[in-house]
Amino acid sequence: DRIRQTYDYCLIDAPAGLGMGFHLASDYADRAVVVTNTDASSLRDAQRTVMELDRLGRGNLHLVVGRVEKKLLRSLHTTIDDAMDAAGLPLLGVVPEDRNVPYALNTGIPLRECSNYAARAYENIARRIMGQRIPLMRI
């Protein structure tokens, strides 16, 4: 309750899987953002996560699809709509594959200073969480 009184938003990065860390994070969530990649394994994990959140009675669920590569989507004959259908969630945002992201993570340099593209995608997602109507980026 102290956190709710102090902050407008508190983001918790729950661990992969549906173990204790996931349940602890979901117990206090007003909203859940399921983050997935476009590969089949990630989409199956997203489906399981959504099913568990539904079972727990959690609402206000959204999807972020990360590490999106246009060429890979074409070669797999998949689309962002396929990811939305698999998860059964509305899309909050798409993050393009960007090799500057690991560089920023490993060096501690803010992503905004390394990559305008991925940083803009994350900023757009944050703005949508705050209720702003921001168009999706073209990948």
Residue ranges and their predicted role:
Residues R2, T49-E52, R128:
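A generic secondary-structure signal
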Residues A14-G19, Y28-Q47:
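Conserved Switch II/interswitch segment of TRAFAC-class P-loop GTPases
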Residues R55-I139:
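C-terminal lobe/tail of nucleotide-utilizing enzymes
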Residues D1-G21:
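Phosphate-binding/switch loop-helix module in NTP-utilizing enzymes
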Residues I12, V34, H62-V65:
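Structural beta-sheet core signal
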Residues L43-L61:
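Conserved C-terminal guanine-recognition region of P-loop GTPase G domains, centered on the G4
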Residues R2-Q5, S26-D27, R55-G57:
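Conserved catalytic network of the ASCE P-loop NTPase/AAA+ motor domain
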